[in-house]
Amino acid sequence: MEYKLVIGLEIHIQLGLKTKAFCGCKNEFGGVPNSRICPICLGLPGSLPSVNVELINSAILAGHATNSKIRRVVKFDRKHYYYPDLPKGYQISQNDKPICEGGSLLIETPSGFKKINIIRIHMEEDSGKSLHLLDSENQSYIDFNRSGAPLLEIVSAPDIGNGDEAVAFLSSLREIFRYLDLSECNMENGSFRCDVNVNLIVNESGIEYKTPIAEIKNLNSFKSIKAAIEYEELRQQEEWIQFRKTLDSCGKHTRGFDDKSGITVIQRNKETVSDYRYFQEPDLPLIEIDDFYIDNIKNLKLIELPFDARVRLKAQYGLSDFDVTTLTSDKHLLRYFEDAVINSSDPKKVANWILSEVLSVLNDKGISVLEFNLLPSHITELVEFIVADKISGKMAKKVFSEMMARKVPASVIISENQLEQISDEFVIKQIVLEVLNENPKSIELYKKGKDHAIKFMMGQIMKKSSGKINPILANEILLQSLANV
């Protein structure tokens, strides 16, 4: 008996638009409950929605970024269901004619690149938010500030084979939306939410069976998503062995994931499309989009995406997979690097400095590269001093610290403190000879194979030069001189 895990994802991304999807209320996170609402948000009688054109523009841009086909006629539908945080009793969404279809993303797996197909991207509005207070057993509250917030829902094909692939797909999608400034994609504040559909294909003696699909909710991190998938795979294997439930006989159900226990718990049977009683939104007209409009959004707003940037950086600068992945994790960090290497003779060394020293400072201070107080050109100049052997790597770190403290270029600090390395071979030979003449016992110890003698003499050389001598060159000249003694 063989099991194949099948995973599909439904991702809701709240767009960072100034106003909501179908009214003029501000689209912001948090704030005083029920302070950003209007009759349209609440679905009061007589209120009429109007489409936020930026919602359509964002959907078109997302379609371009995911290689999707973009529909030329936009239609909105009413999706009916009853829940306390949905005051209208329906959600404005898209049913049979989503704005984008047939897209795909490439993800990187241990065995190479894998294409994950995207079934559809559609536009809709968010619901309100139910608040259940810990100090009250009988009362719940509803904040409608989120009601009507603009959403895109991305539905992947069931092409994902394990938790790692699911996380890779979500990470790639999040990177794209952040690069395009479409959304912060923050799972903590709910601007990036994911439901995971999981089932198994069981092969018994050449006959295939499909287990019931579990739609898993309450997933608040990539770690939770991976853990839920791994648990659900084992649960469905055990359920198949005991009860042999199939998709045809049991259909689809919803389960919640409990972070503390690491298990999924059944919530309800999943609604079918007919349960939602979809019909075309009568208060919103069909919207026609021509090719010029679609192409114009692509030309104006579609920038180089992370995957393409990684391929280019590896080819252009010979950087490692780790380096390019880290540099492209933030488009502002990538821009900082690109600005720093424009006039650099050693792009790899610039990358190393940004990924080690600069990122260390950013992480320690909890700031972004946009808030960093040194310009890319400052890093370029500092690295050039190292490449030219004018300062050592150790000295460069001290210079870097003073650069940040004083907000001045490396050249100013190096000049003021006379920190340039001594790399003149004639000068170094003179210092080496002085040390050899002053330490005949160390020479004898070296000839007897005592390695510590070399360290001692190098220490004396560094002391005589006040630490300014080029240690690599000094060590070479010392060994040459000892060979001739």
Swiss-Prot record:
GO terms for biological process: glutaminyl-tRNAGln biosynthesis via transamidation; translation. It holds the Pfam family GatB_Yqey. It is an enzyme of class 6 (ligase). Gene3D superfamilies: 1.10.10.410. Keywords: ATP-binding, Ligase, Nucleotide-binding, Protein biosynthesis. It catalyses: L-glutamyl-tRNA(Gln) + L-glutamine + ATP + H2O = L-glutaminyl-tRNA(Gln) + L-glutamate + ADP + phosphate + H(+); L-aspartyl-tRNA(Asn) + L-glutamine + ATP + H2O = L-asparaginyl-tRNA(Asn) + L-glutamate + ADP + phosphate + 2 H(+). Its EC number is 6.3.5.-. InterPro entries: Asn/Gln-tRNA_amidoTrfase_suB/E, Asn/Gln-tRNA_Trfase_suB/E_cat, Asn/Gln_amidotransferase, Asn/Gln_tRNA_amidoTrase-B-like, GatB, GatB_Yqey_C_2, Gln-tRNA_amidoTrfase_suB_CS, Gln_synth/guanido_kin_cat_dom. Signal peptide: none annotated. It comes from the Bacteria. The keyword Nucleotide-binding applies. HAMAP family: GatB (MF_00121). Belongs to the GatB/GatE family. GatB subfamily. Heterotrimer of A, B and C subunits. This is Aspartyl/glutamyl-tRNA(Asn/Gln) amidotransferase subunit B.
